[in-house]
Amino acid sequence: MFSAQDTLAKVDPELWTAIQAENRRQEDHIELIASENYVSHAVMEAQGSQLTNKYAEGYPGKRYYGGCEHVDVAEQIAIDRIKKLFGAEAANVQPNSGSQANQAVLMAFAKPGDTIMGMSLAEGGHLTHGMPLNMSGKWFNVVAYGLDEKEEIDYDAMERLAREHKPRIIIAGASAYSLRIDFERFAKIAKEIGAIFWVDMAHYAGLIAAGYYPNPVPHADVVTSTTHKTLRGPRGGIILMKAEHEKAINSAIFPGLQGGPLMHVIAAKAVAFKEALTPQFRDYQEQVIANARVMARVLGEERGLRIISGRTESHVFLVDLRSKNITGKAAEAVLGSAHITVNKNSIPKDPEKPFVTSGIRIGSPAMTTRGFTEIEAEQVAHLIADVLDAPQDEAVLANVQAKVAELCARHPVYGK
C-alpha cells in the first residue's frame, strides 16, 4: 500500500532537487522560446492523477481492456471539446506528440516512395515535413517550397511545384514563420491536383482557437497540432479530420503507431481545451500577438535589428543577428546568462550551420501567460538589444539580469 506521506521529496530527494531548480529557473527567467508555455495548476493536477495507472488500448466504447468506463468519459470529453474549439468533424486526442500525430497522417495517406510537399526547414518549415534526416524525408520523395524575395511564402512557386510533381500530400504549416498562412489557397491547389491537404497548426493553434489566425479546419482534409505551445496544454498531440478520414487516422494511431494511450495526459488535454473555450483565453491570445508585435517593432525599428519577413502577424518572429556580428548560438548563450531564454534559429539563406545559425527565434506565449503586457514587452525587447549590443560587458549583463529579476518578481508564473 502506498502512503500519502511518501512524497517525492522524501522518496527521491535527488530528483526533487532537480525539479525545484527547474521551477526556480522558470520563475526567475523570461521565457521567449516560441514553442514553450506554462500550464495551469488544473492541467498539472489532471496529468498527475490516478489515470496514469490505466491501460486503455483502443478508443472510447471499443477497448481491448476492461475497466475503461471512466477513462472513456475522460477521453470523450477531450474529443468533444477539441471538436467544438476548432469546428472539426472528427478528432483523435491520443497522439503522444505532434511528431507522432504527423507520422500518423503520413501512414494514413501515403506509402513509402510517394511524393509529399512541405515548407523547407531552412526557410521556416518543420523537420517532420520532409527533412532528410527525419522519417518523413527518408521514406518519401520530398518537394519543398519556400519564401519569395519579401520572405513571405511563395504561393506562385508552390502552385507550380504542385502541378509539376503532383504530390500525394501537400503540407502547410511552419515552426519559424511569423505571418498568416493562406490555407484556402493551399486547399485550392490540393483539390486541383487531387492531393490530400494537411495542415500542421502546432505553433498557431491557440491563436486559431481564439480567432486571431486563419482556421485551417474548414479547408484541410486533416489538421495536426501539439497541445502545448500557444494552446497552453500538456505536451502531446491531436489530429482533427474530415469525418471520412476518421477511420484511417484512428487506425494509423492505434494500432499503427501507438499502443495504450496516456490517459492522464488526455485528461490534462481535456482541461486545457476547456480553458481554451473561455473568454479569458481569447483575451490572452490577443495579448500574445500584441506583445510579439511590440518586441518586433522595438528590435527592428528602434534597435536596428532586421526582422525576418519584416514583421509578425502571430506569436513568433525571427531576428537576423548578422549586423551585430554575433551568431545565434552565441546570442542564445549570452542572453541565457542574463536570464532571458531564446533559441538559436536558422534564417532564410543562412550561411551558418544549423547548430550555429545567424538568427534567434523569439516568441511571446510564455511571457504573456505570466502577465506581461505591451509595457513589459517593450522593456524586454530593449533588454535583449542591450545584451546583443554589448555581449562581453559584464556590467551590462548584470544590469539586465537585475531588471529581469524585477520583472519576474512582479509577475510570477504560479501565484500562491
Curated annotation (Swiss-Prot):
Superkingdom assignment: Bacteria
Localization of this protein: Cytoplasm
Keyword Transferase: yes
Transmembrane segments: none
Pathway(s) the chain acts in: One-carbon metabolism; tetrahydrofolate interconversion; Amino-acid biosynthesis; glycine biosynthesis; glycine from L-serine: step 1/1
Catalytic activity: (6R)-5,10-methylene-5,6,7,8-tetrahydrofolate + glycine + H2O = (6S)-5,6,7,8-tetrahydrofolate + L-serine
GO process terms (BP): glycine biosynthetic process from serine; tetrahydrofolate interconversion
Cofactor: pyridoxal 5'-phosphate
Residues carrying the site annotation Plays an important role in substrate specificity: H228
Coiled coil: none
GO cellular component term of the entry, any: cytosol
EC number: 2.1.2.1
Residues bearing PTM N6-(pyridoxal phosphate)lysine: K229
GO molecular function: glycine hydroxymethyltransferase activity; pyridoxal phosphate binding
Chain positions recorded as (6S)-5,6,7,8-tetrahydrofolate binding sites: L121, G125, H126, L127
Subunit-structure text: Homodimer.
Role played: Catalyzes the reversible interconversion of serine and glycine with tetrahydrofolate (THF) serving as the one-carbon carrier. This reaction serves as the major source of one-carbon groups required for the biosynthesis of purines, thymidylate, methionine, and other important biomolecules. Also exhibits THF-independent aldolase activity toward beta-hydroxyamino acids, producing glycine and aldehydes, via a retro-aldol mechanism.
NCBIfam families linked: PRK00011.1
Family: Belongs to the SHMT family.
Protein name: Serine hydroxymethyltransferase
Biological source species: Aromatoleum aromaticum (strain DSM 19018 / LMG 30748 / EbN1) (Azoarcus sp. (strain EbN1))
